[in-house]
Amino acid sequence: MTSAGTGTVWAISDLHVGHADNRTVLQSLRAVSEQDWLLVVGDVADRVADIEWALRLLTDRFRRVVWVPGNHELWTEERGDAAGLRGQARYEHLVALCRRLGVLTPEDPYPVWRGDGEPVTVAPLFLLYDYTFRPTGTHTQAEALEYARSTGVVCS
C-alpha cells in the first residue's frame, strides 16, 4: 500500500474519547492536506463503541488511518460494553472493526508513505507488556505475573 504526492504523516495517542472534553477536541482535528495520514497509536478509548466513533471520524478526515492498540483498548474490562470480549478475542474484534472502516492495523501489510523525500515504511508494531517493568515489591518475573493475576490484569 503506498501514498502518492505531498502531505504529512501525523501521529496521535491517548485520545481517551470516553471523556466528553476529549471528544470535543478530537472533533476539531482536521487534516491539513488531502494526502495526510494519521497514525493512531494507542488508548483511543475503553469502550468499543467509542473506538468505532473515533476511528470513523478520523477516516472521514484523513487519507489513511493506521491504528495500534494501547492498554485501554485491550485490557480495560468493559462492564456493559456491547462487545463484552477480552484478550485475543477482543483484539481480533477490534482488527475486524478497523478493516470494516478501512483502518490499517498491525495485522495488515505495512503501508509505504511516499511523500517528499525517500519512501518510508510505516510499521504499526503491537508489542506486548514486558514484565521486566515490575510492580513495587516484586523482584522476579514470576512474582510480577502472580501480582498481575491477583489484580485480574495479565498482559502476556
Q: Model segments located where?
A:
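N-terminal active-site segment of His-dependent metallophosphoesterases
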Residues: 1-67, 73-79
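Beta-strand-turn-beta hairpins that frame and shape the catalytic cleft
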Residues: 2-10, 110-124, 145
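Local beta-strand N-terminus motif with an aromatic residue
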Residues: 35, 102-103, 119
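Generic beta-sheet signal
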Residues: 68-70, 108, 125
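Short catalytic/ligand-binding loop motif for oxyanion handling, primarily in non-cytosolic enzymes
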Residues: 75-77, 113-116, 122, 130-133
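Short, flexible/disordered intra-domain loops and linkers
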Residues: 77-88
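Binuclear metal-ion centers of metallo-dependent hydrolases, dominated by the metallo-beta-lactamase
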Residues: 89-91, 95-113
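Active-site-proximal loop/helix segment associated with metal-binding centers of metalloenzymes
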Residues: 121-156
